[in-house]
Regions:
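Alpha/beta-hydrolase-fold serine-hydrolase catalytic core, especially in secreted/extracellular enzymes
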Residues: 213-239
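Glycosyltransferases and closely related glycan-assembly transferases
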Residues: 84-90
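The alpha/beta-hydrolase serine catalytic core
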Residues: 90-220
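Active-site catalytic motif of lipid deacylating hydrolases and related acyltransferases
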Residues: 12-67, 186
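Gly/Ala-rich beta-loop-alpha elbow adjacent to hydrolase catalytic centers
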Residues: 74-84
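Short hydrophobic segments within beta-strands
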Residues: 20-24, 74, 158-160
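Short beta-strand-to-loop junctions in surface cap/lid or active-site-entrance loops
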Residues: 4-14
Length: 239
């Protein structure tokens, strides 16, 4: 697998704060947060461990955004669901689990579960009960409750075209216009961050700083062969 970590963008989000909101059974120590730090070495990436109970997690996130005032919030899966509700900030929701209760019931997330990443509190396992699933169902009822025209311009949704777990693209699009599919699954890997997250972060950073970048538009026909297939030059430009 190609590694994209040697590539970094020191000026991207320089001096700014990014809040990363992890997914279910993950933690702030997730590799995704480390990748964001390596791509943007002069930005501060905050990645707190979230409490298991959604009301507690949402309270922690609201306290965090009030005290830290992040310039950008990025959330994945369950974290994408929470991120949508952190109104007043620029946000990127990746494979957001807006139907978290149903997702937990349908994808073997009941009973004893092990955290995928180390937590600061040392907890390694939890028991997912019907009561906890009900808490998540109730939390997701608050999604999209404060969508305005201004919020619609501040939120981006990214959805893996091969995601076997979360399918909320159409639901997101009912409330926010800036939604795209990317080639990938549910878990956010380095390649997806490099090709899809970083360009959106750059656009947000430019908008925040009032920067206008020169653009060169290349028509698809110039990069396709006689059979309509991509030339090697297209692959090189993409990579």
């Amino acid at each position: 697998m190609d590694s994209y970590l040697p590539k970094s963008y020191p000026s991207l989000m320089e001096g700014k704060k990014i809040l990363y909101v992890h997914g279910f059974l993950s933690a702030g120590s997730t590799h995704t947060a480390d990748v964001l730090r390596q791509f943007m070495p002069r930005a501060t990436v905050l990645a707190p461990d979230l409490p298991v109970h959604p009301a507690d997690a949402m309270a922690l996130l609201k306290e965090t955004v009030e005290s830290e005032r992040p310039d950008l919030i990025i959330g994945t899966s369950m974290g994408g669901m929470y991120t949508e509700m952190l109104y007043g900030f620029d946000r990127i929701c990746v494979n957001p689990a807006f139907e978290m209760g149903a997702t937990m019931s349908e994808h073997q997330m009941m009973g004893k579960q092990t955290f995928q990443n180390p937590r600061q509190d040392g907890v390694q396992e939890i028991i997912v009960t019907k009561a906890l699933v009900k808490e998540y169902r109730e939390m997701t009822e608050h999604c999209f409750s404060q969508v305005t025209a201004e919020e619609q311009q501040r939120v981006f949704g990214l959805f893996g075209d091969e995601d076997p777990i979360v399918h909320t693209y159409d639901l997101f699009l009912q409330h926010y216009p800036q939604a795209i599919h990317f080639h990938g699954e549910h878990r956010l890997v380095e390649k997806a961050i490099y090709h899809y997250i970083i360009p959106i972060v750059r656009w947000i950073d430019d908008r925040q700083t009032g920067r206008n970048r020169p653009s060169v538009l290349i028509h698809w026909d110039t990069l396709a062969d006689a059979y309509g297939q991509p030339r090697s030059s297209l692959h090189k430009a993409y990579e």
